């Protein structure tokens, strides 16, 4: 029997998922790792711990199924995007902890570049905005801050990579320094129109181009690893949100998916032509196959599932995320408590890194149920913000059905609330492991085990469709209250 091994390296855990030749999940292993918060607004990971947990989960699923390396046709990697690692080319040791996508320490660098009139240049080439979210200013910070790092980088002694690139380097024993187009497109240094690193942008950031990985298709040869008992090829790579877009089979222009994990990330396929957003969305690469780039509009929300984690860990009003829907359903419908969950700033379409969370509409009767309802509704309202922006950029032909995945999509209450606040149907697929499936399909398709795009799209199956039940007048009044709350939070 033939298998595909998917590595899903996320923000809070490393996972390995083994798929069989029919794209069925047969085994999963997961290890959480430590989150480091050395200062307010800073988030770091130990890249060595990421590496160790990744190897451990891979070995666990392989051993658990009792299979040999010759039965694994390929490895597909998907990863948290933007998170930045700089490591020693000779020994492979990181020179600093990985700076996570959520980290806001480079806000001042972004502001200086913005004041210098550089943002239009960045956006024109990369499709991105000047924000600490992206990798470029994180690399600059490491080179400027770690003693000797800038000189070593100039001498060609240091390498940069997002998590995929670091894992590929380690898996191949340092033989391959490469990334894929979707991860490169999130660095703030990649020209998404030319499909190459931008010399001009790298000069603005003072990042030597010798540090940068080679950029390849999402389904390509990324070398082989011998860490699992024999030679196994690495054949697929995509950033987590792009992998979910692939896993949701959003291959046609106008199709849209939204993934609900720690944050929420919505992508709308725009086909082979990039669409420049007029609503402060991101223009990015959805996937690149056979040298052909397919583009997307993306909206990034920093806090989605993390709001539910706050209910559990910060307020202690639930013991686990699965309880959130039932508690929210008990909220007083006469109350209009609104949470603006700007715990790490606001993402699209506002891009306010200094904004902080706020709650509005509290009364003496507001309690755990109302707080829980407000947290879940905040995710729906933020998705509505992205929905409106994407409709504005793409036009009337945008798909009126949203495909959803991620942990929060398992909640019927939350998904019904999402449909109500969007005023549009929400589709949840049978296969919820869309991110891992996307990575597995890339590797399996490259290996000749899995079908082509059309064949893969035909396997997508609906679990549940949530249709709007909210009266339109009530929906629009509630959305106006949300917009007013966001405006107030940004003024504090």
Curated annotation (Swiss-Prot):
ADP binds at residues 11, 15, 262, 305, 407. GO terms for biological process: glycerol catabolic process; glycerol metabolic process; glycerol-3-phosphate metabolic process. Pfam families: FGGY_C (PF02782), FGGY_N (PF00370). It is an enzyme of class 2 (transferase). One of its GO terms (molecular function) is ATP binding. The keyword Glycosyltransferase does not apply. The keyword ATP-binding applies. It catalyses: glycerol + ATP = sn-glycerol 3-phosphate + ADP + H(+). GO terms for cellular component: cytosol. Inhibited by fructose 1,6-bisphosphate (FBP). This is Glycerol kinase. The lineage of its organism: Bacteria, Pseudomonadati, Pseudomonadota, Alphaproteobacteria, Rhodobacterales. The gene is glpK.
């Amino acid at each position: 029997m033939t298998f595909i091994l998917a590595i899903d390296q996320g923000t809070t855990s490393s996972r390995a998922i083994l798929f069989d030749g029919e794209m069925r999940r047969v085994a999963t292993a997961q290890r959480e790792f430590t989150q480091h918060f050395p200062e307010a607004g800073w988030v770091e990971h130990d890249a060595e711990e990421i590496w160790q947990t990744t190897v451990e989960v891979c070995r666990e699923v392989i051993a658990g199924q009792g299979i040999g390396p010759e039965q694994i046709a390929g490895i597909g990697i998907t990863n948290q995007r933007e998170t930045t690692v700089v490591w020693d080319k000779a020994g492979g040791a990181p020179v600093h902890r990985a700076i996570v996508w959520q980290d806001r320490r480079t806000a001042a660098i972004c502001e200086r570049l913005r004041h210098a009139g550089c943002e239009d240049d960045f956006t024109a080439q990369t499709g991105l905005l000047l924000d600490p979210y992206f990798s470029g200013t994180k690399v600059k910070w490491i080179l400027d801050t770690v003693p000797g790092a800038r000189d070593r980088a100039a001498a060609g002694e240091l390498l940069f990579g997002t998590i995929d690139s670091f894992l590929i380097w380690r898996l191949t024993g340092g033989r391959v320094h490469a990334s894929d187009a979707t991860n490169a497109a999130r660095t703030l240094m990649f020209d998404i129109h030319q499909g190459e690193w931008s010399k001009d942008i790298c000069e603005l950031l003072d990042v030597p181009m010798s540090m940068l990985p080679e950029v390849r298709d999402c389904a390509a040869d990324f070398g082989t690893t011998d860490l699992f008992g024999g030679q196994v090829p690495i054949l697929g790579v995509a950033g987590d949100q792009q992998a979910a877009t692939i896993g949701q089979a959003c291959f046609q222009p106008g199709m849209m998916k939204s993934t609900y994990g720690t944050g929420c990330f919505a992508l709308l396929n725009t086909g082979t032509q990039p669409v420049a957003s007029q609503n402060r969305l991101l223009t990015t690469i959805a996937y690149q196959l056979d040298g052909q780039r397919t583009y997307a509009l993306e909206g990034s929300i920093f806090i989605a599932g993390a709001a539910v984690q706050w209910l559990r860990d910060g307020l202690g009003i639930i013991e686990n995320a699965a309880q959130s829907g039932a508690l929210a359903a008990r909220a007083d419908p006469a109350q209009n408590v609104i949470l603006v969950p700007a715990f790490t700033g606001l993402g699209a379409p506002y891009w306010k890194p200094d904004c902080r969370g706020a709650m509005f509409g509290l009364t003496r009767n507001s309690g755990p149920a109302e707080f829980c309802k407000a947290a879940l509704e905040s995710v729906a309202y933020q998705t509505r913000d992205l929905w409106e922006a994407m409709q504005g950029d793409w036009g009337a032909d945008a798909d009126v059905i949203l495909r959803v995945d991620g942990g929060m999509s398992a909640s019927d209450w939350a998904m019904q609330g999402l449909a109500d606040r969007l005023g549009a149907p929400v589709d949840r697929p049978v296969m919820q492991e869309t991110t891992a499936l996307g990575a597995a399909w890339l590797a399996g398709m490259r290996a000749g085990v899995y079908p082509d795009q059309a064949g893969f799209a035909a396997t997508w199956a609906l679990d549940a469709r949530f249709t709007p039940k909210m009266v339109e007048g009530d929906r629009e009044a509630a959305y106006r209250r949300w917009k007013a709350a966001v405006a107030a939070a940004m003024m504090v």
